[in-house]
Design a protein with these regions (language model features):
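Conserved NTPase motor "head" modules and their coupling/switch loops across ABC/AAA+ ATPases, GTPases
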Residues: 2-14, 260-333
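Phosphate-binding glycine-rich loops of NTP-binding sites
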Residues: 336-347
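Short, low-complexity, polar/charged sequence segments that are solvent-exposed and flexible
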Residues: 196-200, 313-317, 346
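Conserved amphipathic alpha-helical "coupling/scaffold" segments
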Residues: 1-178
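Conserved P-loop NTPase architecture
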Residues: 99-299
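Structural motif
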Residues: 176-178, 293, 324-326, 345-346
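Short helix/loop capping segments that flank catalytic or ligand/cofactor-binding pockets
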Residues: 187-190, 304-307, 336
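Glycine-rich loops and low-complexity Gly/Arg-rich segments
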Residues: 201-206, 319-322, 342-344
Length: 347
């Protein structure tokens, strides 16, 4: 399952290297002020937003893609926060019940994976419920694709099948393991088998006892019990590893969903602060860098606006086709951002 809320065709890379001048760039733009307003003391929102801003996206299609998703977020802020809270719950629940999944023994790995997948099944059902209840109010390509995927892949039939298989893998009636004889008559190729369904009582009474080969280990035969335990572990080892990998896959999905939602949570926090100050916001129309299109009305310094108690005065510019701009610093005494620009076209 893919998230794709930052890019149309790939995940957001939280490990991507920052620009060589990231520190100086952050200081010049006073990003700490902006990031503080975005994060509201959420460390993940702070880190993801910092990387998203410093690793500047210049692809017009990617920018428009994110703008559509952000517009959905602004129309449905409570839904976005509900999604983010659900991802946080998933990560926290994973921490609490993952002690077995990292164990050395297949039986412990199997037990831990079953417990974790049962928890995740409930969380995935709740996630799909959010998509079903609110999908009609989201129109962006990113959220439309995400919600469609959740509704398609997490159907009631699928989740019921998962629950049934997890219940069966608890092996309450013991483990049926097959093996072949290898060199020295040692058991090899141990495989966990699904036992046949038991016949009804009347059938068993009519057929009578069935012949079988069996043996019983003495109560104090520790070596025999240990040998049986090892054979059982060899049989369930492939299944335990497969379940653990499935749990890891779901953890990765919730982790990436949390990471990419964190950026939009930061945008929501910032929008609330601007709205509280009565400051205008907009979605600019991006164009390719070589178009030299520079037109804006009421542009103001966001960080200055966040730090000043009073309002700030915006600036208007019509500078299409200009190549050079000289921008002065902020005039805080006059409570305004001074935007001085001169331009000349190179021959």
């Amino acid at each position: 399952m893919n998230v794709f809320l930052m890019y149309k065709d790939r995940d957001f890379d939280v490990q991507a290297p920052l620009p060589w001048n990231a520190k100086e760039l952050g200081q010049d733009l006073e990003l700490q002020t902006l990031l503080g307003a975005m994060s509201c003391d959420d460390k993940l929102v702070l880190e993801v937003s910092r990387r998203a801003l410093l690793i500047s996206e210049t692809d017009v299609q990617a920018i428009v893609y994110r703008q559509g998703i952000l517009a959905d977020c602004l129309r449905n802020p409570q839904v976005i926060r509900e999604l983010y809270d659900l991802t946080q719950e998933a990560i926290e629940r994973r921490r609490k019940c993952s002690y077995g999944i990292f164990g050395r023994y297949p039986s412990a790995i199997l037990s831990g994976a079953i417990e974790l997948l049962q928890v995740f099944s409930d969380l995935l059902r709740r996630l799909r419920g959010i998509a079903e209840r609110n999908g009609a109010t989201f129109t962006s390509e990113g959220f439309t694709s995400l919600f469609a995927m959740l509704k398609q892949e997490l159907s009631d039939e699928y989740l019921a099948l998962v629950a049934a298989q997890l219940s069966e893998l608890r092996l309450r009636s013991g483990a049926l393991v097959s093996a072949r004889l290898g060199d020295g008559n040692k058991g090899i190729d141990h495989v966990l088998r699904r036992p046949k369904k038991r016949s009804g009582l009347l059938t068993r009474l009519r057929e009578g006892p069935q012949p079988s080969f069996s043996f019983r280990i003495a109560d104090r035969d520790e070596a025999g019990a240990r040998a049986l335990g090892e054979m059982r572990d060899r049989g369930i080892n492939p299944v335990a590893n497969a379940l653990a990998q499935s749990a890891d896959h779901i953890v990765s999905f919730f982790t990436m969903l949390r990471v990419e939602l964190a950026f939009y949570i930061g945008c929501l926090n910032l929008h609330e602060k601007f709205s509280g100050k009565g400051l205008p916001v907009c979605f600019p129309d991006p164009v390719e860098a070589d178009k030299r299109t520079h037109v804006f009305t009421g542009l103001y310094d966001a960080c200055l606006a966040l730090t000043l108690e009073g309002g700030v005065v915006g600036n208007d510019v019509q500078a299409d086709g200009k190549d050079l701009f000289i921008i002065t610093g902020a005039n805080q005494a006059a409570s305004r951002h001074s935007f001085g620009a001169s331009a000349s076209r190179s021959s």
